[in-house]
Amino acid sequence: MKSLNFQSVVSQFFEYESTVVVRWPLPFIIIPPLLTFSIVTLTVTNFHLNVTNDTLQVFLPDDMRSLRDLKELLRLFPPRDAQRDTYSIFGSKFVYTVIEDDSSDGNILSSSGIQRMSKLHKFVMGLETSLGDNVASNCLRNKDDEACTMHPIAFALEDTTPEFAIQFLLRYPNLKFGDFVIDNAMVFGDVRIEPKSQDRDGNSPIRSSKAVRMTYILESSESTERWIDLFLSAIPRYKETNSTIFWSSSKSLAKEMERNGELLIPWMPWTSLVLVVFCMFACSSLNIVKSQPFIGFFAMFNATMATIASTSLLLYLQYPFLPLVFIMPFLVVSIGTDNMFLMLKSWRMTKKSSNEEQRYIHALTESAASLFLTSLTDGLSFAIGSISDFHAVRVFCTYCAMAILFMFLFQVTFFNAVMSLCCRREVSGKHPVFCCYEITPPEETQVLEKQSNFDFSSIVAKHLFKILNPLPSRIGVFFIFLAYLFISIHFAIGLPLGLDLKLLAPDDSYVSKELEAQERLFADYGGFCFALVRAENISLKDPMVRRNLIGLYRDLGGSEYSSPSEFWLDPFEKKNRGKKYSESDFSDELHTFLAKEPHLKFRNDIRFTMMGKIEAMKMMFRVRKLGKDNDAPRAEYMRKVMENSQFNGFVYDTSFLLVDQQMTTVYNVIVDVVSAILTMLSICVLMVPRPVSAMCIAFAILSVNIGVIGALAATNTRLDIISMITIVMSVGFSVDYVTHTTFHFVIQRDNRLEKCLLVMTEPILQSALSTAIGVSLLSFVHSYIVRTFVNTVFFVVGLGILHGLIFLPVLLDTIVPDSEYMVPYEPQHEDEENPNHYEDLYGL
């Protein structure tokens, strides 16, 4: 009696489907390539790449606390002063240079150093496009008749004797003339000061500075984009003695991220060539008639065609595109050959019969459950990622899931038809390459017969069985597994968290070098962070309320991670000394205060309602102790102070986006991995409905992924959205190894361990090798993003082999009872007089 389970339903469906394909192969060979060609043609004729310019937001979740705070800050206080309103970084245009002194004294403020600074500044100011675009014509101005918005040091460097003009500016962190303040904290790097000469505002004369940063803030226009492109192409050629030049711009990170994809393109043809050669070689044998090189070639062709069709369809539908997607073809094409090895193994295991058509149908039906499981688990692991909160994860996983869907559809149609013709060629005794020529099959001598039954994989499987079967060996495997698990968990616990912007660009990128220099040279003072206080329910006419607000301002800036910078109420109270007002008198006094220099800038720090009442106000703080290690403590301290105050509001800094992203990433990784494992386990239970075996599958999947995370941590990979994609991907990949092993174990009645190893050793080794070869060439690409994917694939492959051929078979043979047996689906075949369609490949 046939077993009524999901596996038998899948097998029966493929029996009927393969019957149609084998009898009428021509339509299935023609239609998929025509469909692919049609999709590509539609895409090319209406080509438009839907890419986003919000580089940082691509790697942020759709909704998180700091992102909501940023949107409210932008709504209530639209940026008007690019030097003060630094939260406008997402929309502003700028370039900047950093010149670091490499001489023995390490002081860029020496006479020769200032001359080098002046030459660099004049070089940047002198850059001009063929259309006449330059800094002067594109710089940001507060008013049309005013000079460019630049630090006074820029004007000093244009002087004929800049070394004298600059001397008047050398105080740190600020230079103060009465009520006029010049911010030097972001200009001078690695500063040494004269602490004994500190003034009452905490500013000291600069004794030396190793580096100087010059920022050029620009208007948003097409001419600005052209000039920035000119700057980025010209500045790498600029050289200065005893100096190192760093540079960046508002579009640099986006352009360098795109270069990750560009670095992959030259490797695509080489990877395809290597995989084609490997697959054709793996499908060949010493028996020339049984060699199937074209099956290997068309397996690669099928995977490539599916990748092209799926990508073209998504582009035609205007689905977003990211440079990260360039990694997808390498993964999909590599795993696309796995099913081919299973199908070929099944074909070679079937006995010769009078009805060769039925023989092929039987071979395909026998491997149908495994084929379906491979595609379903890989596809679902990416499908889970395609509903992620992160834009980059969602886009990448959608492209991968769509490619796997097309690959499965083309596999059961196009590739099945091609393989049926190749098998007919083998049965008719034609040449494997020159199919028109018949060849005389070699005489089936005793040596050849022994060779056909005992190939390399069979020898490996038999030796593996002899090693694993004795009880002492099983105990040894158990302790090896415990050591593996302990080491993996130890490293996984220490996995560094959070996105490091330096790693988004290629290793040799000028952006990575500039970000590293920024952390090294300008770590003491950073940009501004902000606090927003909603004022609907408070009355500022009350001096106690004003005093409490100033107290909040002092508390927020009272840690080692931030210091007070500007708050309009501070000078207002110093002027009015806690005076009590009526509502109208306070309003008049405030407007008088804001109407005169140097308080005009505070107009942008107060939001008024249509009725003239204060709706919200903004405080500014200077960020201290730059670096990712201090971002989380800063966010925690400032948010806690705001929450414990009596006022309604929030604090915001650009680094808070990365802090929140870090916490959201951890949560999403846990949710996605658990969801993926539960989904995979549900599918595996459907395919192998046996409780103990299902428990072994779940344990093995979890073990593989713990090992992958531990291995990633050991190679200094961070838990960010890049590794998040790869971890979710590894869940689907790991299922392929452990479930096939379990399935082929439970369908055996006796000698289960040996038969399972004999069946699974060759496909596991071949598919693992093809997957590893497919991405191995990418190890030469110097990019953290690419390196993370390559490492993950290698780890999954290595641990998959370890579990699929050693840990899991031993576990199954030890704890799965003989009663937990599953009857495999037996297809309906015409030659009932010989129902045993399988050769005795086990040698038992």
Swiss-Prot record:
GO CC terms, sorted: cytoplasmic vesicle membrane; plasma membrane
Gene3D superfamilies per UniProt: Multidrug efflux transporter AcrB transmembrane domain (1.20.1640.10)
Name assigned to this protein: Patched-related protein 9
Gene: ptr-9
Family, per entry: Belongs to the patched family.
Cross-referenced PROSITE patterns: SSD
Single biological process term from Gene Ontology: molting cycle, collagen and cuticulin-based cuticle
SUPFAM superfamilies associated with the record: Multidrug efflux transporter AcrB transmembrane domain
PANTHER family named in the record: PATCHED-RELATED, PATCHED-RELATED PROTEIN 9
InterPro entries per record: HMGCR/SNAP/NPC1-like_SSD (IPR053958), Patched_domain-protein (IPR051697), SSD (IPR000731)
Domain (SSD): residue spans on this chain: 264-421
Pfam families per UniProt: Sterol-sensing
Source organism (scientific name): Caenorhabditis elegans
